[in-house]
């Protein structure tokens, strides 16, 4: 098994490239199936967020991943290769550990990425594209990333893209309490935005979603009016703040729509934050006066501020990554001995049960228990050591001193000899 992590993120690709390869929920099953149709790919999972699209798979031919990604999204392979990274084996595990721990996020230490990776893994398991090879790798990564976050404290005082959005609103508006907020989308990011805004004193929400039931749940939790996506033009003029975080493939808020809303607001300022990838709001909306439009890339400069306390934690987390990586390598190597250990233990258990049943029959027949137990002990020792004894004699006859040293190590005879000498 060769673990490979391949993809692009906010560090390697601008938003106009990331949105072209972003995985839409409706496409997830078909893309995973298409990926597994490649004869070179044995197992795979795909993670897609606003800041990254990554493929985790078992393959000996990682170069096919870039070709597949370009073909599926109708992009030039030459163009995509400028932004793509491929990490194999140990480096692939290290990269995935860094992602799961929040070390590779735009906002260092943000906790959402681990949940998103778990969801991607669980979906791939349900679809059958993750099986016996990748399953233990992901499970180890999830356990290790939890240890890293706990020990380093990198997840203390949780911060996310959603929280950064709320902080940005606070810089532009002095009073949260007077704001009317139009929240478009009802997923995890939208829920976090609503939660943080509510904690800061916002009580006037308009909540629109393609799934009305999800919008109603948000409205019940934080208060507000539930709308459908089709209601956006009618209610947009009422919003001081518009935050959009849907999974729509194309923008649905354009310049003319916002311009019309401004006219009805008597050109009172509007703050629009597009947290979606692909974008929900056309970029030329920012050309309008009294409109402040930001997308996820615009949050980068703000995110850097106030992260100093996390940078120290990140340094410690990086050290823990190396330690966990060493642990993973040892654990993965140990898997090669798993079948041998199981077979050996089963063999020893069978021998022990045979001798135990023989001894119990003799005791039931009235023989002296002490004599039976002495015989049981001697016979068990002889049977357990019979094959190893024959093997040791053979390697001694063959003058294989290296194998004799290995036997001493396995049977720990040096330690026992030292113990005997100490006692005598």
Curated annotation (Swiss-Prot):
Catalytic residues of the enzyme: 50
A Pfam family it matches: GlutR_dimer
GO BP: any one term: protoporphyrinogen IX biosynthetic process from glutamate
Binding site for substrate: 49-52, 105, 110-112, 116
Sites marked Important for activity: 95
EC number from the UniProt entry: 1.2.1.70
GO terms for MF: glutamyl-tRNA reductase activity; NADP binding
Keywords per UniProt: NADP, Oxidoreductase, Porphyrin biosynthesis
PANTHER family: GLUTAMYL-TRNA REDUCTASE (PTHR43013:SF1)
Misc. comment: During catalysis, the active site Cys acts as a nucleophile attacking the alpha-carbonyl group of tRNA-bound glutamate with the formation of a thioester intermediate between enzyme and glutamate, and the concomitant release of tRNA(Glu). The thioester intermediate is finally reduced by direct hydride transfer from NADPH, to form the product GSA.
Free-text domain note: Possesses an unusual extended V-shaped dimeric structure with each monomer consisting of three distinct domains arranged along a curved 'spinal' alpha-helix. The N-terminal catalytic domain specifically recognizes the glutamate moiety of the substrate. The second domain is the NADPH-binding domain, and the third C-terminal domain is responsible for dimerization.
Record family assignment: Belongs to the glutamyl-tRNA reductase family.
Protein name: Glutamyl-tRNA reductase
This protein's encoding gene: hemA
């Amino acid at each position: 098994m060769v673990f490979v992590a391949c993809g692009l993120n906010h560090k390697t690709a601008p938003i106009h490239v990331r949105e072209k390869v972003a995985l839409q929920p409706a496409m997830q099953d078909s893309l995973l199936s298409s990926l597994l149709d490649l004869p070179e790919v044995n197992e795979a999972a795909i993670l897609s967020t606003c800041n990254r699209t990554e493929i985790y798979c078992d393959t000996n031919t990682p170069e096919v991943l870039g070709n597949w990604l370009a073909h599926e999204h109708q992009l030039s392979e030459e163009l995509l290769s400028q932004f793509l990274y491929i990490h194999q084996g140990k480096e692939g595990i290290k990269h995935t550990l860094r992602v799961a721990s929040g070390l590779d996020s735009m906002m260092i230490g943000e906790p959402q990425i681990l949940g998103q990776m778990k969801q991607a893994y669980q979906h791939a398991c349900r679809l059958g594209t993750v099986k016996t090879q990748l399953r233990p790798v992901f499970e180890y990564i999830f356990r290790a990333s939890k240890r890293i976050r706990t020990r380093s404290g990198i997840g203390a005082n949780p911060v996310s893209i959603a929280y950064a959005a709320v902080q940005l609103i606070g810089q532009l508006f002095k009073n949260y309490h007077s704001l009317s907020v139009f929240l478009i989308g009802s997923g995890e990011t939208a829920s976090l935005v609503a939660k943080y805004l509510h904690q800061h004193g916002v009580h006037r929400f308009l909540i629109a979603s393609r799934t009305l039931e999800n919008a109603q749940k948000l409205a019940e939790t934080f208060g507000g009016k539930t709308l459908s996506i089709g209601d956006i033009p009618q209610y947009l003029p009422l919003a001081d703040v518009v935050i959009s975080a849907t999974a729509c493939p194309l923008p649905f808020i354009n310049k003319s729509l916002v311009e019309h809303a401004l006219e009805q607001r008597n050109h009172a300022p509007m703050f629009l934050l597009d947290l979606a990838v692909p974008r929900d709001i056309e970029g030329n909306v920012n050309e309008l006066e009294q409109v402040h439009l930001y997308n996820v890339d615009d949050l980068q400069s703000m995110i850097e501020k106030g992260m100093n306390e996390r940078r120290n934690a990140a340094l410690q987390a990086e050290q823990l990554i190396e330690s966990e990586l060493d642990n993973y390598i040892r654990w993965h190597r140990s898997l090669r001995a798993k079948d041998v250990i199981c077979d050996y233990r089963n063999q020893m258990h069978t021998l022990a049960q045979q001798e135990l049943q023989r001894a119990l029959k003799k005791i039931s027949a009235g023989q002296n228990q002490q004599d039976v137990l002495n015989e049981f002990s001697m016979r068990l020792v002889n049977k357990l050591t019979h094959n190893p004894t024959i093997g040791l004699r053979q390697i001694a006859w063959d003058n294989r001193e290296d194998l004799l040293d290995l036997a001493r190590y396995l049977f720990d005879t040096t330690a026992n000899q030292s113990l005997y000498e100490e006692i005598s």
